[in-house]
Amino acid sequence: MYAVIKTGGKQYRVAAGEKIKVEQIAAEVGQEIVIDQVLAVGNGAELKVGTPLVSGATVKATVVAHGKHDKVRIFKMRRRKHYQKRQGHRQQFTELQIQAIAA
């Protein structure tokens, strides 16, 4: 069984037992969270698509870790004007272990 969930403005296809990295969630490591924004639920033979959400469907997950992605480097330059600007950014993430999908 799998589900398509929405969290942090992005959509993820998840199944029980998987680990996924999502945008940072305000939860402690080891805490169990419930994601109720389920867009679709499938089990191979059939697919249940919500409009926009599947009513009564939830995904239970445990917070495994918090961290930062690799640095993205931004470089701006204007030719012939001796203007150069360098900037870096590291996006924070939360790693989740999917426990169960209830549809």
UniProtKB/Swiss-Prot annotation:
Keyword Ribosomal protein appears in the UniProt entry: yes
The name this protein goes by in its record: Large ribosomal subunit protein bL21
Record keywords, A-Z: Ribonucleoprotein, Ribosomal protein, RNA-binding, rRNA-binding
rRNA-binding in keyword set: yes
Role summary: This protein binds to 23S rRNA in the presence of protein L20.
An annotated GO BP: translation
GO molecular-function terms, A-Z: rRNA binding; structural constituent of ribosome
A GO CC term assigned to this protein in UniProt: ribosome
Residues in coiled coil: none
InterPro entries: bL21-like, bL21-like_sf, Ribosomal_bL21, Ribosomal_bL21_CS
Alphabetical list of Pfam families matching this protein: Ribosomal_L21p (PF00829)
Assembly and interaction partners: Part of the 50S ribosomal subunit. Contacts protein L20.
Membership in a protein family: Belongs to the bacterial ribosomal protein bL21 family.
